[in-house]
């Protein structure tokens, strides 16, 4: 009788032994359905010698209930899961949940109903129907896709279906993924960039090689590591690019498409369930050649991974703060070690840990010291607010206001940065001096005027702003102290009423779509 040791996705359980039914082929990494009492749980078969447990007699073992028809989790990824669980003190089951984040992805192929023109003309041909038929000649897609392409409503197309002008066609929902072309639009690199690109590309296919790509802002780091991705594609391997924020995904996808002719597979928390399913299956099958994503993309089951790139490797947002609390930058290096592939850490401000690794000889360093096309670094000036203070009740220095005004006169844009979300960092009572503190952690409550609430940026507690002071009961005595981005935006709107302004924080830009809309508005 054959036994299988299984790690279920229930963190409260340890490894469990099951009997493998006749005819079921289970190997380490196989994704199985394991019975537990009246329930059935997803689990992953594991090497028995790596996960010791109490031996159970063969006669007491329950048979596995099923085997999921997806590729097994490869040994390098299993070793990474073990390392992550051990290093970050997390249950192995919790780590495996990041490998198998979508139960829908484990289901079989689905069918999708699409529509295409039949060639017949409906008896009643309205201008909208005529417009749709002209635009859809030779095309096929869902009602939503065809309506968007033709510039008409869904109802117009459904009317054409009822009239026999469009026919339904059942197709596989898992459409083929586009394959990036490494030679689609090679960039013109300067001598330093060519040397750096050659160094990175030569590392692909030659084993574990962590590289710190250290380049000043605007030096072309992205174009350089794109050449390493191109070499990875030429060798028929998969590449992974990690970004610190999902808001950066859409702009990056456009740059990637301009270089390789199509967009890569995206992976982040804002994807719809159907998109996550398609992306996961494409990655697991090896069909997805390049994946761009946030932290969680690191644990996906790439069967033929050849390169990992961590863009903006200095960013603290690579640290996962809930669930399994891991650092994606360091964990990516470990995945590169287990996969025996190069890992590129791209940054303009290298973390101290990475520089130390270079000093110790554990990382290789590739430097880009000059900006692309001879561009100069910006002129930086510090304004002494004790010598040039803003007027009472204002926060922008007069010299800064003058420079913004000159920028507007030239038709140029201005970016103002302040590391404080909301309207004001502190709310207090003018009558008794009471300061609003979080009841959970005693941090100050930050006023968010756009969302009409007070919020704690430490623990997440929120409350509506009261009309009276809770300490002394005085009404209309509450005052906001200090500036947040919303307050600065109000001041800018007062000073420059004809200028178009936007607030960019995690409160207003919470998805790649919103980020893309903002970037589009800036570029318009």
Which residues does each PLM region occupy?
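Accessory, non-ATPase domains that flank or precede helicase/AAA+ motor cores in DNA-metabolism machines
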Residues: 1-347, 354, 359-375, 409, ...
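Accessory helical-bundle/CTD segments and flexible terminal tails appended to RecA-like ATPase motors
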Residues: 97-124, 381, 386, 434-437, ...
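Inter-lobe coupling/hinge region of RecA-like P-loop helicase motors
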Residues: 181, 377-399, 504-506, 514
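Conserved interdomain hinge at the start of the Helicase C-terminal
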Residues: 229-230, 388-417
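Conserved RecA-like helicase motor-core motifs
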Residues: 240, 260-271, 439-440, 446-449, ...
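Conserved helicase ATPase core of P-loop NTP-dependent helicases/translocases
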Residues: 272-284, 500-505, 509-524
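SF2 helicase motor core recognition
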Residues: 293-305, 492, 512, 519-524
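Cys/His-rich short segments
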Residues: 400, 409-494
């Amino acid at each position: 009788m054959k036994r299988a040791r299984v790690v279920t996705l229930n963190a409260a359980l340890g490894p469990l032994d099951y009997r493998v039914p006749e005819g079921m082929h289970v190997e380490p990494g196989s994704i199985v359905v394991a019975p537990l009492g009246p329930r059935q749980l997803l689990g992953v078969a594991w090497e028995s010698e790596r996960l010791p447990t109490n031996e159970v007699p063969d006669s007491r073992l329950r048979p596995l209930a099923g085997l999921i028809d997806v590729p097994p989790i490869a040994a390098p990824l299993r070793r990474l899961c073990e390392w992550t669980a051990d290093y970050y003190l997390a249950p192995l089951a919790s780590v495996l949940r990041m490998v198998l984040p979508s139960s829908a992805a484990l289901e079989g192929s689905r069918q999708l109903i699409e529509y295409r023109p039949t060639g017949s003309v409906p008896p009643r041909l309205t201008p909208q129907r005529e417009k749709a038929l002209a635009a859809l000649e030779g095309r096929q897609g869902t009602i939503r896709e065809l309506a968007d392409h033709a510039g008409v409503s869904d109802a117009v197309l459904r009317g054409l279906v009822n009239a026999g002008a469009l026919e339904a066609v059942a197709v596989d929902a898992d459409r083929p993924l586009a394959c990036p072309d490494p030679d689609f639009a090679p960039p013109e690199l300067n001598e330093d960039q060519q040397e750096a690109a050659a160094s990175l590309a030569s590392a692909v296919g030659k084993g574990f090689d962590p590289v710190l790509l250290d380049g000043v802002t605007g030096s072309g780091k992205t174009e350089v590591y794109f050449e390493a991705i191109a070499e990875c594609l030429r060798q028929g391997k998969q590449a992974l690019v990690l970004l610190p924020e999902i808001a950066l995904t859409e702009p990056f996808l456009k740059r990637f498409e301009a270089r390789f002719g199509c967009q890569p597979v995206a992976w982040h928390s804002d994807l719809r369930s159907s998109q996550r399913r398609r992306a996961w299956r494409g990655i697991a099958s090896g069909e997805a050649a390049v994946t761009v994503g946030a932290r969680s993309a690191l644990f996906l089951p790439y069967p033929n991974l050849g390169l990992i790139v961590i863009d903006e490797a200095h960013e603290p947002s690579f640290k996962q703060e809930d669930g399994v609390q891991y650092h994606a930058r360091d964990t990516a290096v470990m995945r590169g070690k287990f996969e025996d592939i190069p890992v590129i850490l791209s940054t303009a401000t290298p973390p101290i840990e990475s520089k130390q690794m270079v000093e110790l000889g554990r990382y290789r360093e590739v430097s880009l010291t000059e900006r692309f096309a001879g561009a100069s670094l910006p002129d930086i000036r510090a304004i002494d607010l004790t010598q040039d203070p803003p007027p009472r009740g204002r926060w922008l220095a007069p010299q800064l206001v003058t420079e913004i005004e000159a920028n507007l006169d030239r038709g140029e844009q201005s970016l103002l940065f302040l590391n404080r979300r909301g309207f004001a960092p502190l709310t207090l009572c003018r009558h008794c001096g009471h300061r609003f503190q979080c009841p959970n952690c005693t941090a100050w409550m930050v006023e968010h005027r756009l969302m009409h609430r007070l919020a704690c940026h430490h623990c997440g507690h929120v409350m509506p702003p009261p009309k009276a002071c809770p300490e002394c009961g005085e009404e209309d005595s509450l005052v906001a102290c200090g500036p947040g981005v919303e307050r600065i935006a109000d001041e800018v709107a007062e000073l420059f009423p004809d200028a178009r302004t936007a607030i960019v924080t995690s409160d207003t830009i919470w998805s790649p779509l919103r980020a893309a809309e903002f970037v589009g508005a800036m570029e318009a």
